[in-house]
Amino acid sequence: MTKFPRWLAMLVGLLFPLSALTQQQGLTIDIVGGNTAATPIAVLPMPYHDSVGAPATDVSSVVAADLNRSGQFRTLPLGQIIERPTHGSEIRFPTWQALKQDYIVVGRVLDARQGTYRVEYELFDVRNGKRMLGLAMTARASAMRDVAHQMADAIYEKITGLRGAFFTRIAYVTASGSHGAMRYALMVADSDGYNPQTIVRSAEPLLSPDWSPDGKKLAYVSFEKGGSSIYIQDIATGSRELVSSFRGINAAPSFAPDGHRIALSLSRSGNPEIYVMDLVSKQLIQLTNSFGIDTEPAWSSDGKFIYFTSDRGGRPQIYKVASVGGTATRVTFQGNYNATTSVSYDDKKIVVAQGSGNVYRIAMMDQSSGSTVWNTLSTGSLDESPSFAPNASMVLYAAREGGRGVLYAVSADARVRQRLVSVDSDVREPAWGPYRSVH
């Protein structure tokens, strides 16, 4: 069966058939595959140094899980950790050299009083014994997972030179119930699926969530009024604004890097075209005017260009146009179907849903070398909606397995893949959020 294109399904409000499911909970995660060439690192247990009131979060296990799923690191299994130093002065480096570890992380958790904890940790290069990092963080028990993600970010950046993206959030849509009584929810969770938060619930489809650059708001499409409308909602307060409810199609909102504009697809003048809306004045600028369907805009990091999906040439392909208007140019030429693009932070790469026959997979186009190089990242047959992590080290996407929707996060080299599943609902429409502020 030929897949009903996502970009057209979005415009008319159709979704894949769903099995009977109940209310949604958080996402569970499991690692699929591994990278044997990844950098070996030992993240040692970090014991709590007090008699009562240990935090529920095992900080070291969260750090290890983050590094593992990045695809860049391979942590030493707990059963192979034969010594457990908690300070750098206690490390016997020949032990870890014999275990073929390149790096080691040690630390401890202390009671900082008044309901807070202090985590102290150190990163060492096993080969020369040099301390690369020595930091401490204090937080309440409820924020210990945030602390662990920030630790993983610091370790990742110190070794790779690239900012980590573990202390980030993802947005996604869940769908549950039967055909006669479907329920949808727009959710936000940590990058590893923990700490889910419901942003909005609806009896009608919710589509195309997109993060504001500061991570405080989400734009999305709702069908609660019968037709499609675009809302922007504050994550912390829940307040929301209806920004587009024109006659016809209102679809695919995408925040500009400045946060003051969105690109969107509207059919107010006939065919769906790409527009830019000023969020203060609500003034519209029409960027495209073709006989085909133009939708799914995505901004370049500098805000000068907008990539979008169009079937103006007969089949869906990716094009780009200046954000102030002008002639659109075609970007993708490989294959008969390229849609739903996400652009990396440095504009050197894009990811798309790429179709061949009845198989749709996530593919990345790398232009950093001056020539176009494609790499297939996913392995399913109905994969869609790719979204880059803010450092472009991983890609989040939606897939169909056994008749239901799941999410995957895959490393940019395609060697490590993690599955994020809800036990009681379909999951789809993922969007990886921006970097979060560290307070």
Swiss-Prot record:
Superkingdom of this protein's organism: Bacteria
Keywords from the named record: Cell cycle, Cell division, Periplasm, Signal
GO (cellular component) term, any one: periplasmic space
SUPFAM superfamilies per UniProt: TolB, N-terminal domain, Tricorn protease N-terminal domain
Pfam family, one: PD40
Keyword Manganese: no
Endpoints of the signal sequence: 1-22
Localization: Periplasm
Single GO biological process annotation from the record: protein import
Assembly and interaction partners: The Tol-Pal system is composed of five core proteins: the inner membrane proteins TolA, TolQ and TolR, the periplasmic protein TolB and the outer membrane protein Pal. They form a network linking the inner and outer membranes and the peptidoglycan layer.
Function in brief: Part of the Tol-Pal system, which plays a role in outer membrane invagination during cell division and is important for maintaining outer membrane integrity.
UniProt similarity note: Belongs to the TolB family.
Protein name: Tol-Pal system protein TolB
Protein source organism: Xylella fastidiosa (strain 9a5c)
